């Protein structure tokens, strides 16, 4: 999930939000995407776990500070952030 030839890495952001509803989450994701694009940060993936009242986002950026700034600008305080995450989505055939 890294851009080759750059120092970008992936960050897992967690937001704990009671009463997550799809319409509100869609609005937040749209806002995060717009702010991230303007800041040269990529929002790669979002996951919602309603039973845990948690929204997860995976961002690619040059620094943790850039991700935190994007989240703040979008109006969402980061509850937890983990640097250097990697993900593999889907299976590859052999």
What positions do the PLM features span?
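Short S/T/G/P-rich N-terminal loop/turn motif that feeds into the first structured element of a domain
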Residues: 1-38, 86-94
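Short, glycine- and small/hydrophobic-rich beta-strand elements in well-ordered beta-sheets
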Residues: 33-55
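Residues that cap or initiate secondary-structure elements
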Residues: 19-21, 52, 63-65
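Short C-terminal domain-edge/linker segments immediately following a structured domain
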Residues: 42-47, 75-78, 87-92
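Short hydrophobic/aromatic beta-strand micro-patches
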Residues: 58-60
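An amphipathic, aromatic/His-enriched active-site/gating alpha helix that lines ligand/cofactor pockets
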Residues: 62-87
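Residues in well-ordered beta-strands of folded domains
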Residues: 14, 44, 82
